[in-house]
């Protein structure tokens, strides 16, 4: 994990520094970081899980390519679950990975206190699997759906759902992508290295939380084509991408019990959601635009380069729709009270002695940053608990 301890003004206590120093900024991103700092902000290097060795490029698995964000890594250089956990685990003879397998339901013993069988369809063939411990890591939507599908006479509203909260409190963040177009091209390849949290808890004008500013991976014309009008010329999209800084803005999505996962009469997943915290997000976007108008004057054009390709401030952006579920959390929340939570502090179901949920479902609130590192850290924590339990 790359990062610099103490840069993020919202950083909580850490037991020690990051294992690797932060990924460096490319020149255009460094210039923007310097501009933000000049304005009194505290920009910081985005913590990144990549296998990068900047001191010795020949020894580096990561090559700082433009497809790091949003694409599988073809050289296995992301510190993701596959590279760090699944692939090493498969080196052991007692680990089996079943592909094309769909877990239909979890069946309990007659007492309802433990899971007896995991019912799987594997390439159309029904199978039963059993184990002393069952861990669901399907993601907040599919874990909730699995528990609801697994209702029985002991768990009439869904497995582990005596509290009635399984599927509720779905959160996926209030997210937007904003392209800031400028006269000067942006030659950056590895763009996702800078973040700003100065408005995480609000601003002088707005005393409520606003959120987090960072970057997406560098956009290109082909990526933009998916959201552009059908008749948009390809060269226009290419030109826009070559002259853009591509921001990702995240605001906290509040835990509304009516934002929830349910099943329809055929067992299909229904995601019901009403957006919230929209005013804070709008103000975050406006604040970023205000900051961009105060950039250092361009040495080439003699004025704010960000006046845009068409001699005016120009932004292109969109809110991420409900289908953008990458940050899904909250549907099987943990807590000490079985009446208001489905999991205990170790992410074990209150109602089922051998069921654990270790994905984003356990979150009680979403925060306003990518939940991936928190999910990973919690998985390691629960793993230590399981080792102790199985001794």
Task: Give residue ranges: language-model regions.
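Active-site rim elements
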Residues: 17-23, 72-75, 270-279, 366, ...
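Glycine-rich loop(s) and the adjacent beta-strand/alpha-helix scaffold that form part
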Residues: 92, 101, 105-109, 116-190, ...
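FAD cofactor-binding and catalytic pocket of flavoenzymes
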Residues: 39, 163-286, 325-330, 350, ...
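Alpha-helix N-cap/helix-initiation motif
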Residues: 78, 132, 159, 277, ...
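A conserved FAD-binding loop/helix module that cradles the flavin
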Residues: 365-386
